[in-house]
Amino acid sequence: EAARVFTGFNLAFRHLNIDPETAIPSGKGYPQSHDFGTKQFSVRFNNAAISPPSQDEAGMLAELNALTDMIFAQEETARHFCRRLYRMFVHRNITDEIENEVIAPLAQTFRDNDFEMMPVFRQLFGSQHFFDEDDSDNADEIVGGIIKSPLELALQAYAFFQIPIPDPLTQHADYLRFYQHGLFGRVLGFGGMDLFYPPDVAGYPGYFQQPGFQRQFFNSATIVARYKLPQMLLTGTLAWGPNSDASIGTKFDMAAWVRDSGIFSDPEDGYVLVQELLDYAFPEHPDGDRFNYFLVQIFLDGLPPADWSYEWVNYLATGDDTEVRIPLGRLLNAVMYAPEYQLA
């Protein structure tokens, strides 16, 4: 029956029809192609019937509005929206408890506010549940419950590590290399998120495909693009695949970043440096054994902490980053390879 409501609507030239509420171009109704009969819906829609008040384009639009109102009057519509929001921002799994204690109140807020999204966002993002403070059950973690999309993985790295972006006016060629070849061509294209070109009209599988959802972004075909990102940043090249030595138009100077970013309170102290980096990079701080893996095995490479302190002081005095670049590079690779870093 709903399909009958849509009969007679078609494309129109962009400038001919402007929607009065949104001020954006809209399609056009052609009454000669519309089914003006009464549309009788099932018990799931309370046996509602939709009939046109007039047999012209205004009547067609009235039917369309009636169909929209009928759909939004259903409690399940609001719940569906809120489930989609929950899976986008919190976690892919919705248990019966979450459905009753989180989704249902959000849906009620959605309906009570005439389907305005902001009150729902405020309620969700301000809840104890969102910050994983509503219980002590370690088996239902909210923080770190979502796998980053390739876009999130790349842009968060660019922002956090303060990667210098080439100026599009004075460094036009490098700007194109950075975005077209580096970000779009290598990280996103091979990472399973060819930007603006989803595989079908439903969008990217990571946002809707059950039961995996965001796990769709992390598989045997896309993992290389994710794990080669630190090498791309440190070498300033595509790092892998065709033309692996080609420049991406910029390069990450990690020693200068550690020195100048203001993130690290005492870079000379290896323990403090690793601790503060992990606090920023991971959803939650790792436990003792995991932390020691990054500090002792990766960063210090089994050497005494004093070795790093000496190398850092020497770097500050001479500007030569040869010795500090090696342990910092090991640490960056290990952190960005870590499962924890792939989570948000």
Residue ranges of model-derived segments:
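Flexible, low-complexity segments enriched for small/polar residues
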Residues: 74-113, 122-344
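Short loop/turn and capping residues at structural boundaries
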Residues: 15, 120-121
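Non-catalytic, conformational "gating/processing" segments within enzyme and secreted inhibitor domains
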Residues: 1-96
